[in-house]
């Protein structure tokens, strides 16, 4: 969907379950911005990264993504937040699906921030974004993310008005 758009600049706001390295890479290739809510815990993009063990943080990450596992890649994987291996069975459109053993390892570079912030006394949200830290501090990110709720409730109201209660979004 991103690739087919003629829009020159956009900010893609999305909820959990839309997070994937492939989606983020497509948005980055288009020179768009993204702000996705991501899962906390042992699943999702944040699970494989070295993140602070604190309630709130803002961590810039520059990943080299590959779909080849070599001894050199294994060494890079030991360095926190440096390299990410994505198995070939997982979709990633910016690396070759097949290659010979003699071919050099290819990497795709992806830069983003993972930010965790408080939204109420006892709850937090974790987001992934490529918006610059200087231009978009945590307070701005909170406001941008809150705008997504307006879209969500408008979509729900439209579904009920049109009688489309069983219409669901798809990944």
What are these regions (language model features)?
Residues 1-171:
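Single, function-defining residue in the core of a domain
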């Amino acid at each position: 969907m991103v690739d087919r758009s003629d829009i020159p600049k956009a900010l893609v706001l999305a909820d959990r379950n839309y997070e994937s390295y492939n989606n983020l890479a497509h948005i980055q290739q288009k020179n768009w911005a993204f702000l996705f809510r991501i899962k906390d815990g042992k699943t999702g993009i944040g699970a494989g990264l070295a993140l602070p063990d604190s309630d709130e943080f803002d961590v810039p990450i520059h990943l080299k993504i590959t779909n080849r596992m070599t001894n050199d890649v294994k060494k890079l994987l030991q360095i926190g937040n440096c390299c990410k291996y994505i198995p070939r069975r997982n979709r990633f459109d910016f690396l070759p699906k097949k290659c010979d053993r003699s071919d050099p390892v290819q990497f795709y570079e992806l830069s983003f921030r993972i930010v965790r912030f408080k939204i109420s006394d006892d709850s937090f949200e974790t987001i992934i974004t490529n918006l610059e830290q200087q231009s978009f501090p945590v307070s701005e990110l909170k406001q941008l993310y809150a705008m997504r709720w307006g879209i969500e409730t408008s979509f729900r109201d439209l579904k009920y008005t049109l009688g489309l209660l069983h219409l669901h979004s798809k990944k």
